[in-house]
Amino acid sequence: MAIKYSALNLVPIREGEDEQTAINDMVNLAQHLDELSYERYWIAEHHNAPNLVSSATALLIQHTLEHTKHIRVGSGGIMLPNHAPLIVAEQFGTMATLFPNRVDLGLGRAPGTDMMTASALRRDQHDGVYKFPEEVSLLQQYFGPAHQQAYVRAYPAVGKNVPLYILGSSTDSAHLAARKGLPYVFAGHFAPQQMKEAIEIYKTLFEPSDVLDEPYVIVCLNTIVAENDDEAQYLASSTAQVMVSITRGRMQPVQPPTHELQNILTPREYAMAMERQKISLIGSENTVQQKIQDFMETYGEVNEIMAISYIYDKDMQLDSYRRFKNVINQINEKTLYNVINKLSESMYP
């Protein structure tokens, strides 16, 4: 099975820069990935986060679509408790009208922010998480053919069949994705604890649908591929600082890399950062290739790896995504070679 490669962007602000620069960087990265033939480029949704510019996800997706040619662009994801499904369908149906066969709709059941901000987003609606399965079904209806519609229709979404993806960081979403026969995307970049169990549940309980005949798993992982392991670890110190700033409640911009990470962080924070790296793809091309193979042995095969990186140096970030493509292509070539060899052995024993 060939692995596809894609990317997620939270549109972070780098230290010393502003929101406009972060959005420009988002577009520049999208154009780079478009040229590299990445499968898809997703943009997250976060609110009341001073270091991220991903609060108006649909607008950023449209802006990215306007500045790219081929790559699929979507949400990673739209946090459905924050939005009326009708509005989501209208927005994504409009984008699918403007950019046919290029729009994805990844859906999450968490608010993507703190509870006070979530309350401000949905005002008197406090049960959005529990309505998630019902609202996913409603979106499927809105994007479906005319004969499936009710009185309220999400024009121009009708008949657009925008692909839906169920996002998750726990086993709850795995059950829903399996039951509905939809692709499943696990947030291994920030909540890997239940990843193995969730993927197993999804694959075991999967029910074929009009969308998929068999399970389709995407895992999102922190990914930094550099010329050598030491350089990759150095670049990854920015990621560690981002993660620690979240736990401290400070939400700092992306910091420059440092060789003094152990001195900047507390022993507990440093241990946490090193533990997180165990489930990250950080290293040279050879190292990352081996890490992906180890990942498959532990978690089972996945269809697609969605890379996310907090690399301060923009050129190094672009280079990392180029190297990541090389890694996936090398793995796919080896897989194809092995398949051909097995076929040859069976035909000519």
Predicted regions and their residues:
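Flexible, glycine-rich active-site loops centered on histidine and acidic residues
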Residues: 2-4, 8-19, 81-144, 184
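Hydrophobic faces of well-ordered beta-strands that scaffold small-molecule active sites
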Residues: 5-9, 41-43, 73-75, 103-107, ...
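Active-site mouth loops of central-metabolism enzymes
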Residues: 9-24, 78-85, 158-168, 277-283
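An alpha-helical appendage that flanks or caps ligand/catalytic pockets
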Residues: 125-153, 194-301, 332-349
